[in-house]
Amino acid sequence: MKELLRDLITKELASCFADGSLSSGVFPSIVIEKPAHAEHGDFATNVAMLLAKAEKKAPRVVAEILVSRLQESADICSKLEVAGPGFINFYVKDEAWRQTLIAIDRACADYGKSRIGEGKKIQVEFVSANPTGPLHIGHGRGAAIGDTICRLLAAIGWDVTREFYYNDAGQQIANLALSVQARCLGIEPDDPRWPLDGYQGDYIRDVARSYLGQETVEADDQHVTAAGDPQDLDAIRRFAVAYLRREQDQDLTAFDVHFDVYSLESALYAEGRVEAVVQRLIDSGHTYEQDGALWLRTTTFGDDKDRVMRKADGGYTYFVPDVAYHLSKWERGFTRVINEQGADHHSTITRVRAGLQALNAGIPVGWPEYVLHQMVTVMRGGEEVKISKRAGSYVTLRDLIDEVGRDATRFFFVMRKPDSQLVFDIDLAKQQTLDNPVYYVQYAHARICSIFENALERGFVLPAAESVPLERLVTLEEMTIIKTLASFPEILEGSALNFEPHRVTYYLQELAGQFHSFYNRNRVITEDAELTAARLFLLKCVALTLKNALTVLGISAPEKM
């Protein structure tokens, strides 16, 4: 509806410029919003106020000129008015709103989708966990947010590439190998010989057992057979990384999260990309040596202090391979890149961007874009749950999926803005009551399916969309539902463009609430065949929209509950 009104305004502006009613020739960005109060109409725009200066006219005068034209062409409106300092308020006819139902029925599974992205390439990197243990709840929230952002962007026409970056090099991987080796040798965590900063979860014991049993592990591009020699630390490292990559893959598959590309930090070193980037930075003149270390002048690009690239011992700091990795993204043609990461990565953003700018590779300032999510606190019985037996020191994603199910886990992870801390209430997520938001939404869909099953049993066949007497939908409740249905494409677009999946969960709860309230107050199947047909058609559109919105969140729309 907003797009239709925007097109009408643009058309009438052009007409006014053509005949001299308005003279500036300026086409401002036309913003159409829903007024705070219903008595001010369905939509409002401040376009006249934006034009006033260029036209050298009072905003209300410009608004009156536009309204006089729009009254002739905006036949979807019952009334237009100039309000306040120069707003134009639009009152859309009920019959125009009802036509939304026809559009929903025609679009079916595609309702809400658009081609805003025009098929342009965009890469989203998310999860990117170190292969040192099971995925924890922070990874889980990142997986849900990242995957939903991908689904949203695809829904509005972007060509999305999902990428996972494995930090499979560095000290953490060395600690993993030492921990598995200790288990292979029968050394326990309370033994003085246990490695410093070693991993103590039960999963280390599982990896060691599989390694000694000379098992074969397949994980993405790796096919690794354990050597079984507890003294071969390099073989242990390769096997442990492959084993834990496979476990992470299995957890993500159970979460219905999939990737198109897997990139390895170790490959950046093996292919010489890290050394090549360091040399390019040296050649660019943005580095200097001090205290035996190589520094990058990141302050030139907005950092609060310069950063060490290569330590005195010859090792690279962690942001250097990150710069090499992101350069590879740029060279692969991704001019738009989104990184979904935990908020603990905030400090690396400036360093990575500074390194990319220093390369003089034509990469724009502010590339890549970041979505950072805050921590998750898991509660059960009013108390925080902090550990998992298998992981040893944290709650795993698998723990949540096994306890509350995939749908509830995904919904809860995205139901708050990414930069807000999230309390995951296990007891609430398990409830099969309307207090549980995901149950509340899914039950609305199942309830509508049950209504249609009942109608079919009673011999009622819904006529073709064009034959449904939509004019029978006249109550405030019915029109409110229709207007909410009509807003779904805008919700989808806003959620995608702002990387805010929680907007869809809010929308789902609003629509489900309107349906439950309507159904509790009104009979759908009545003695009045026309009213029954109209209300069934309305509920068909509600069910379609609920399913489409749930699908974009990666959540099922059950027909029975």
From Swiss-Prot:
Coiled coil: none annotated. Keywords: Aminoacyl-tRNA synthetase, ATP-binding, Cytoplasm, Ligase, Nucleotide-binding, Protein biosynthesis. SUPFAM superfamilies: Anticodon-binding domain of a subclass of class I aminoacyl-tRNA synthetases (SSF47323), Arginyl-tRNA synthetase (ArgRS), N-terminal 'additional' domain (SSF55190), Nucleotidylyl transferase (SSF52374). Its main location: cytoplasm. Pfam families: Arg_tRNA_synt_N, DALR_1, tRNA-synt_1d. It catalyses: tRNA(Arg) + L-arginine + ATP = L-arginyl-tRNA(Arg) + AMP + diphosphate. It is found in: Cytoplasm. HAMAP family: Arg_tRNA_synth (MF_00123). This is Arginine--tRNA ligase. It comes from Geotalea uraniireducens (strain Rf4) (Geobacter uraniireducens). The lineage of its organism: Bacteria, Pseudomonadati, Thermodesulfobacteriota, Desulfuromonadia, Geobacterales.
